[in-house]
Every structure is written in structure tokens, then in C-alpha cells.
Amino acid sequence: MAKIRIHEIAKELGYDSKEIIEKANELGLGIKTASNAVEPDIAVAIYEYIQTREIPEAFKKNIKTPTAKKPKKENAKDQEKLNESEKKEPKKEESKEQEKQEIIDTHKPQSLASATLAKRRGLVIVKKKKDEEEIQVKKEEIKNSNDISINNEERLSLKTMFSNADESLKKKKKEKKSFVASKKESTEKMNFLDEHDFGDISLDDEDEVVLPDFSVKEQEKPQNINKKQPNFIRQAVGNSAGFGLEGGIQRRSRKKPPKKIEKKEVEEVSSVSISKEIRVYEFADKIGKSTSEVISKLFMLGMMTTKNDFLDEDAIEILAAEFGIEINIINEADEFDYVKDYEEETDEKDLVTRAPVITIMGHVDHGKTSLLDYIRKSRVASGEAGGITQHVGAYMVEKNGRKITFIDTPGHEAFTAMRARGASITDIVIIVVAADDGVKPQTKEAINHAKAAGVPIIIAINKMDKEAANPDMVKTQLAEMEIMPVEWGGSYEFVGVSAKTGMGIEDLLEIVLLQADILELKANPKSFAKASIIESSVQKGRGAVATIIVQNGTLAVGSTVVAGEAYGKVRAMSDDQGKALKEIKPGECGVIVGLSEVADAGEILIAVKTDKEAREYANKRHEYNRQKELSKSTKVSIDELGAKIKEGNLKALPVILKADVQGSLEALKASLEKLRNDEIKVNIIYSGVGGITQSDIELASASENSIVLGFNIRPTGEVKERAKDKGVEIKTYNVIYNLLDDVKALLGGMMSPIISEEQLGQAEIRQVINVPKIGQIAGCMVTEGVINRGAKIRLIRDGVVVYEGNVSSLKRFKDDAKEVAKGYECGVGIEGCDDMRVGDYIESYKEVEEQASL
């Protein structure tokens, strides 16, 4: 068995290598570094000494008490005894032993011997494996010892020897004996220096064992030996015998023994609870299977995954069935569901009636904002670009001493998410339908949103002051959607109104309050506040701003709040008119300042006790959303792989999108992502709320052919200059129609042009003339249109195209002609065609390119 290195012993025992070196040196082994190697039985001796603090028997027998007064004379006696022992050995080995003895004599100067005596005490043993004996240099005599010899036939692994040694050590601990040596004991270390007459001495064949003085607990390190030992090793390896000399020093093998990997026994798992978002390797660890097993199962099921990919619920359930394990899927979002915690803690005492929240919905340009303007006695619609609402607004009105909160939503098709959000946080929905226009697509969508939210619906038929108003048509169309008016035996209130004259407005508000009384809307103003964010944005000098409607509790200035990934303290609040407020009560709306970032529109805002609690909720939510986003990006099946490869070949228009509010940004992103076909698409590199910054310009410049789109915002002078220097185009809009139309035009320019054919004329071949060195010339009669020189033609025979090419020559009699019109004869030469026949037709045409549009 190969020798064992010190660092392997240290690793096996769980000790540091330095500690093992110290213990080995206490046994006189002369170990210098962790890479030094010892014989297996020496390793066992070190192990026993470390575990029991008892000197092994093999070392006790060799220890004697020499008196080192006359080292030179003793060396002479040693040589005499060595010579006597050599006489008994065969003649072949006599020369080698003499050379070894000469080395011992010549390389032991007085200075080194005295330094060794001062620094280190002990005996030196030189072992020779070849003769299976040890030559021991002592003060008085040399004895042969085979106590520490190696039995080559019984070589065990390091771990086996140590495990066997543990059993013997338990017995030895009971029979501990103290060993005390004389302080006068000393060791003279032989110094092998730079000589060429080493013979066949090998570093692998000899080991040095120093038996120290154990009475000295802390011995000084031999400085002289430490200095010379590295030199000795380097010289010994380098001094290989040259040409004509005997064998040199053998180089020690550098190969490390192969590491043995222990196989861990995996316990069988019958049931396990895992989260929805889990990676492949995490799932494998949970069920006690190897990652490769899980990946191979998924591959057989048609999913190409790596160990870092996320698994969806379907894949988890299928894998559970395959492995025969019961899986309980848990939702990690429950840990930071602050809304659930709030509802559990809500006390139903002290409930009072709150203001109703009304959402006005309907098709674009049906008069929703104008109706609200008349109610509020304001002109919001005139302030909107293009006269269409592109933001969600929340307003407060008072009727008969009672407050009503109105939410105005956009009617444009791009703002579907806004309408859905408005329906989900409202108490009553008013659907506005123009009496002269009837039910439109967004009207149907608004009704579906309201039905999905399960809230009462009131129909307001607007523009009743117009001559073309037809309320019966509106009622009929809505009846087809199962919205039956009360007068027709249904359960829905229909009110005819005019936002221009104010007709029917009072009746509408009366019905709203009556419906609110039926709903019995209650809230506890004394509890922690709970609100819904209907819009959010970034304002210069104020930071993140959110428009909210409080549903329960009272939100005051200084309250600590959390909304999704955003949190903070409410620094200031104001109403829809900009008037500062100190608190917002249930059912009321307002604008708050103080969130750490722009909160997502539609997020629930909760007031909490401490800032630490809010931060923890927000951070956990952020990490969860990040993991969820990563899981979406890594899930792919074999069927989807082809689609992804195809998508990679699409031309893309890189866009950086900035908007004034979160709701508009969502609507724009959704609309732009729909602008695509099999050839082109819009690639939104970055989107955000707020003005266009220099970092946006830098990002756009890093992407080839990218543009910056701004909605309801304007870039500053510095940003414009930066964009000009970088060659980045900035386009700003205040009407969503214009933005979408321009992007469509840009995408159309990126598409391959549409190539169409325009027929020019047709000629009948009546004679074929073979011209030497030129080829065939067709004598033709033009039957339709004109034949142009250089035009593209098709040669048609019996209705089948037999050749396509260009007109190489066109003659009228003997003169060249640019074109020949209908009814005239001409000679036509077709480039590369020598198979023209009488009766064939020549069809002339040109290709026209048209710009594609999306």
C-alpha cells in the first residue's frame, strides 16, 4: 500500500494538519509539511498517540538514555560496529553499506551535531525496506529492529486501519502508563548533503523516525534543520546520477490517491409538502431522488428541463404519480399575505355606514366623463387630451348630506385592465350608453366586468337631448345581453340622462343612494386602514404618489403602510381637488405621498403597526415575485421549443416606454404587445412611470434601432441634447390612438414589401427565325398592351409556362424599338431561350413593390 500523507490523516481525524505535524514530531518522526508521507503502521501509531496520549510500544523499545559528551569518538565506534556487521552480509551488498556509512561519517560536522543537540532531543532511525532491517545509530550500539517494519501483504485502507485501531485503543486507555525519559537524552541527526555517491539509496525506501524526549512538553523548533531541510529535499531530487554513475534519486510520485465517494443511503419518502414555485433539484431533494432521475422522467413526459428550471403544478402532480409519492402543494404567498392577516384581525365592533363607491363605465365617447363633470360641477373631460379619458380618476361628491365616491374609467379598448380594476373595487357600477349609438364592444366588456365582480348595475342612457336618441333601441340591445329593465319586468334600473343639459342627473343620484342603502355598506373607522390603489405615478418633488379609496379603517398622516412591494409612511395626503387632508375615512378617496416606489394599480394597501413589519412584507413579496418571474422564463416544453426558435427569427422593434401613470403604462404595454404578426413584433426593452431620463437614452443607444416612446410626458432640454448626441429618437404623445398608429407604421416599414405583378402586354409567336451566333428570334404580333425592351416575360405554351426571362432584343422591321404597341408586328429575342415555337405566347409584365402595413 502506498504511503499516507499527513493531510489525509488530518482529514480522517478531523484535526488541522499543523496539529498532526506537532504530534508526529513529538514521536520523533521529523514531519515538516502536510504533504510528507509516512508508512501505514506509522499512521496508526500517530492515530493511537493522538487518541490515547500513550506512546506506542514500538517507540518505547527503541528509546534509551545516551550521553552525548564525545560525539566524534562515538562516531568512530559506530563505524567499527557497522563494519563488523557488514562483514557478516554477502559481498555484493558490502560496497553499498560502506558507501552509506561513509555518507554518515562525512556529513556529520560538529557544528550541526551541536545545533541538533541544543534544539532537539531523540534518536534517529534509518529504515531500509529492501533488507527488511533498520540501522539504528546510537551512542553505544547498533541494533536491528523490525518492530516498525511493514508487512506488504497486509495493507489496508486508512479508514480501515483507524477503525481497527479504535477497538484496541479502548483497551489501552484502561492500561495507561506514564513514560518519562531523561532530559539528557539527545539525538544526532544525520545530514545528507550534496554528494553524487548515493548509490541506490531512495527517498521512498528510507524514513526518518526521531524518538524525542517526552519529559519536555514544549520544545523549540529546530531552526537550522528547518532552514536546511527544504534545500536537502530539492537537492536530493535534483541530484540524479549522470552518465556513467550508479542509479540516482527516484522522484516521488505526485499522483494523489483517488477519492472515495461514500454513497449516502436515501430514505424512502411517502408524502411531502412542497411550494408551488420549486426547482427540479429542490423537488428531487424533497422526494429523496437524484436530480437525473427527475430530469429523465420529465424528458419522457415531453419536457426538456435542467436542474435549475421551475416545475409547474401539473408537472409536480405527474411526477408524484410516477414516483408514487403523496404531494401536498403549499402556497408560499400565504406567509406574507398581509391582506389575509388584516381580515383575520379585523374587529366587527363599532361599524358605521360608509360612503358608496360608484364606478362609471362604458364605450369611448359615450359621455362618461361629461356626466361626471356635470355631477361635480367641473370640467375634467376638457382637460383630457383628445377629449377622451386616459386615466382612472376618483372624485367625491355630496348629495343630500351624504358623500358619494365616483371612479371614472377610460372607455378605449386599450384600458381593459383599468375597467376590470374599477369593477373589482366598487360597490355599484353605472354603465353609460349613448342613446344615438347603442351598445358597442366596450359596453359589452364593461357589463361583463361588472357581472364578474358581482356588483349591482345601473344603466344610464346618455345624450337623451339629441334628436337621434333612441332609448328603446338601447333597451332592446341590452335585453339581448340579459340586462332587462325594470319596466320590462327585469331587475335593472334604466335612467335617461343628458350630461349636457343635466336632465335625469338627480334621479340617477337618488337611485344610487337607494341602491347603497339596500347594500348596507358598513366599515369600522377605528381599525387599521385598508385601501385600494386605483392609480399611481411619480411626481417631481413628491416622489411616488398613489390615488386610493379607503375601504375600511381610517388612514391618517404618519401611518405606516404596505402595498405589494411598496411600503413607507404617509407623509402627506390630499383630496381630488388638491386640498390637504389629515385623514381619509372609509369610502372616501384621496392621494397619498410617501411610498418607497410606485405601487401597482389595483394593489391592496394596508396600514401596519411598525415600519419593520411593512418592510418585511414588501421584501418577501419582492422575492416571491422575482422567483415567480424566473419560473415563467424557464418553463418550456418540446412543443413550445419550436415556437420559441421561430420567435427568435422575428424582426423586433426595440422600444423604451415611459408614461405618466401606472394604469396608462399597463394599457400601452398590452396594446403594443398585440402589434405583431409572423414577421415582426414590438420588443419592450424597458417600461416605467415618470419622465424620460438620461439613463433611458443610454439604454436606447445600447440597443440597435430602438426608439423612446413617451405618453403624457415631455423630455427636458438636457435629455433632448443627450438623445441628439447618441442618435436616439424620442417620440411623445398625449393620445393613445396616435401612438399606436405611429408604431404600426414603423412596424410596417420593417416588414418585407408586398410584391405584386402588373400585366404589360401579350404577343403571339407566328414565326421563329434562327440567327447564327445569336439564337432564335420570334416574329410576333402584339395582341394586348405593349411589349417593352428589357421587360420580364413568360413563354406560355398550351397554357403552361415553359420559360421565364427578359426581353433581350426588340425590333420593328430592322430598327430597334423600346416598345411595340398592340396591333403591330415585331421581332423579339428572349435572353437564354432557344425553345420558341410557333403558336406560343409571350406575356410581358413588371413587378410592383408595395409597402406592407400591420
Swiss-Prot record:
Protein's organism: Campylobacter jejuni subsp. doylei (strain ATCC BAA-1458 / RM4099 / 269.97)
Domain tr-type G: 353-520
HAMAP family: IF_2_B
Stretches for region G2: 387-391
Primary localisation category: cytoplasm
Name this polypeptide is given: Translation initiation factor IF-2
Record region (G4): 462-465
SUPFAM superfamilies: Initiation factor IF2/eIF5b, domain 3, P-loop containing nucleoside triphosphate hydrolases, Translation proteins
Name of the gene encoding the protein in the UniProt record: infB
Compositionally skewed regions (Basic and acidic residues) per UniProt: 73-108
